[in-house]
Regions:
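Phosphate-binding/switch loop-helix module in NTP-utilizing enzymes
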Residues: 210-257
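N-proximal, solvent-exposed amphipathic alpha-helical segments enriched in charged/polar residues
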Residues: 14, 18-63, 95, 99-100
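C-terminal boundary of histidine-terminating zinc-finger modules
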Residues: 349-358
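Extreme N-terminal, non-catalytic leader segments
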Residues: 58-61, 68, 78-79, 85-134, ...
């Protein structure tokens, strides 16, 4: 620092020389404080989040790092519901710092930053609904509706605003599963319907509008029209996710829905057995055909838990969902159990994540929900709102 004094004195000002020394000293002090903070930021950004499948740096999740007392604090924003994730992430990041040689306590402020993601070409997201997620299967009987309702309820429990649309016109299940059988939605203006509420989510189904025992003897065009009306003429309000419980199969109805409804991502539900996997592959290829990204595979009835002794058995085989996910380069989002309690809870109108959120059988649903939302968070975001609307007028 000594060379700064002669330079200043040569200009005839001792005061300027002293001020120069003070400024240099202050800058050195700032740099000394910022260097450890930057070191902490680099370590945090290098953390590979197990749900996102990418580093916090790649996800641009680390918003701020600062010194706080004898340690550090960090503000982190993730693109999926973070309820219940704070303690797990805090412990993981503390370990990350220790590995990087930073021996100081860390406190994190964690929040969700759920954005709207891109949908099929020529379609736009629906109003205040950020993301429509379709839950589909190639065949019936694999537990798709149970997966869909627990997915929606798990997201709500983790802090998201969620709705569910029962798109199975021929066999609606959600009224029973949500404990809403016999209830009817209101219509204040006679044009739009208000969804029913259950366990913190909004719900709409053709089952709310017809008698439970009335068969829907409709042809395909009538079904797609009815579903389009249920989707577009319901006052959903602001939602982070709208889960669409799709009808089983891959026929004209499913294809038309996939083309008309702006879907941000699809979840394919299957069981481990080969016959279910064969149809699940058809469902996956259908979404690929209409440019809907498949977020991943959910293997339902992955294992059976005996209600008497707790013995675990793979009744329908093992590893089918994992093999299919690897074959098509998508994620395995979850392996869910076949448990008698799940059936009882769902039939009783209180699905597992609501009826027994702390039970071991509920944990796979919460994990599946977080993996699904994280898979969507890594997809391209919707940019349509940033472009101005162009109107051409003849003069």
């Amino acid at each position: 620092l000594s060379p700064a004094i002669p330079a200043a004195v040569s200009r005839g000002s001792v005061a300027e020389a002293l001020q120069s020394l003070i400024n240099i000293s202050a800058q050195v002090s700032v740099n000394n404080r910022e260097e450890p903070v930057n070191r902490v930021r680099i370590a945090l950004e290098a953390y590979l989040d197990p749900y996102l499948g990418e580093t916090l740096g790649a996800a641009q999740a680390v918003e701020e790092v600062r010194a706080a007392g004898t340690g550090y604090s960090a503000r982190i924003a993730l693109g999926f519901p973070v309820g219940g994730y704070q303690a797990e992430l805090q412990a993981a990041l503390a370990g990350q710092l220790a590995t990087a040689g930073v021996a100081a306590p860390l406190a994190i402020e964690l929040r969700s930053d759920i954005r709207s993601h891109a949908v099929q070409r020529n379609l736009k997201p629906l109003g205040e609904i950020s993301n429509v997620v379709a839950v589909a299967s190639g065949k019936g009987g694999v537990g798709k509706s149970t997966v869909a309702v627990n997915l929606a309820l798990a997201w709500a429990a983790q802090g998201a605003r969620v709705g569910i649309l029962d798109a199975d016109i021929y066999g609606p299940s959600q009224p029973l599963m949500l404990g809403l059988s016999g209830q009817r939605p209101s219509s204040p203006d006679g044009k739009r319907l208000r969804p029913l509420a259950s366990h913190g989510i909004s719900a709409m189904s053709i089952g709310f509008l017809v008698d439970a025992e009335q068969p829907m003897v409709w042809r395909g065009p009538m079904v797609t029209q009815a579903l389009t009306q249920l989707l577009g003429e319901t006052e959903w309000g602001a939602l982070d996710y709208l889960v669409v419980d799709m009808p089983p199969g891959t026929g004209d109805i499913q294809l038309t829905l996939a083309q008309r409804v702006p879907v941000a991502g699809a979840v394919i539900v299957t069981t481990p057995q080969d016959i279910a996997l064969a149809d699940a592959r058809k469902g996956l290829k259908m979404f690929e055909k209409v440019s809907v990204p498949v977020l991943g595979i959910v293997e339902n009835m992955s294992l059976h838990v005996c209600s008497n002794c707790g013995h675990i058995e793979h009744i329908f085989g093992a590893g089918g969902g994992e093999r299919m996910a690897r074959e098509y380069g998508v994620r395995l989002l979850g392996e869910l159990p076949l448990d008698g309690h799940i059936r009882e809870e769902t039939d009783g109108g209180r699905p597992t994540v609501v009826a027994a959120p702390e039970a071991p059988r509920a944990r796979p649903y919460f994990e599946m929900a977080r993996r699904t939302a994280a898979a969507l968070a890594t997809r391209a975001r919707d940019r349509s709102s940033v472009f101005p609307k162009i109107v051409v007028e003849e003069t």
